[in-house]
Amino acid sequence: MSNMITSPQYVAGHGLLEGKSVLITAAAGAGIGFAAATRAVEEGCRAIVISDVHEGRLAASVDKLKAETGLNAVWGLVCNVTDEAQVRALIDFAEDKLGGTDVLINNAGLGTSKLLIDMEDAEWDKVIDVTLNGTMRMTRYFLQCVKAREQGAVIVNNASVLGWRAQKEQAHYAAAKAGVMALTRCSALEAVELGVRINAVAPSLAVHPMLRKSAPEELLRELEAREAYGRGAECWEVANVMMFLASDYSSYMTGEILPVSSQRA
């Protein structure tokens, strides 16, 4: 198998987001959100706001992003997307700091593993509230702000191939991600008149340090074996597709879901 497939090479930025401003939720730490933030700066964004529920991790990520990219126009604000007041505060903060947000990346989500037969309502509700309702809250208020300022924008949502596929112990997460897909399509139709494009990525397996620490090694090997490349995607590989959807290169696309997946073996 080609070494480029098993050991992908990080691609330099090409100015896809030159001069744009970006807001990303759940962007602290070492996952897709921080990879997207790093990629956005590398692709030329002029300013960025990132959020997370963990204050300490968020502050460290802001400092790291500044240090690694050299961009000083980086801000962070704690936000729990299940809280409408915090959602509004985050978007207002970004609109103020960025002078209008060009790109919103809805990355916040929550996943756990449990058989449906053993699941309590509270466990189901928590995953749905963060993953689906949180994306809805961010999208709704952002569209209200865009309408008020009469300036178009782009929204990129983080869905999952589990919105299409079945997997044991993932009924709540899969239902939430399928909802994100439906939300993406329907809100995209409504947002056309506002000059807003809304699309989503649907990763299959994105491997990051937290997953490697939390997932049983046997399960991780099983999941990676299902991918044709024999590995999960690097977080920056998912972020690359987010950057395409956030850029003018996807100007004709709205309401679309792009899988970030190798063909299942």
Identify the residue ranges that each predicted region occupies.
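Substrate-binding pocket helix/loop in short-chain dehydrogenase/reductase
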Residues: 115-116, 120-128, 211, 219, ...
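Residue(s) in the substrate-gating loop at a strand-loop-helix junction
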Residues: 160
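Active-site helix of classical SDR
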Residues: 139, 176, 184
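C-terminal substrate-recognition "lid" of short-chain dehydrogenase/reductases
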Residues: 136, 231-261
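Canonical Rossmann dinucleotide-binding motif of NAD(H)/NADP(H)-dependent dehydrogenases/reductases
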Residues: 10-49
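Alpha-helical segment proximal to the catalytic Tyr-Lys
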Residues: 144, 189-193, 251
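Short C-terminal tail/terminal secondary-structure segment
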Residues: 2-12, 31, 165, 226, ...
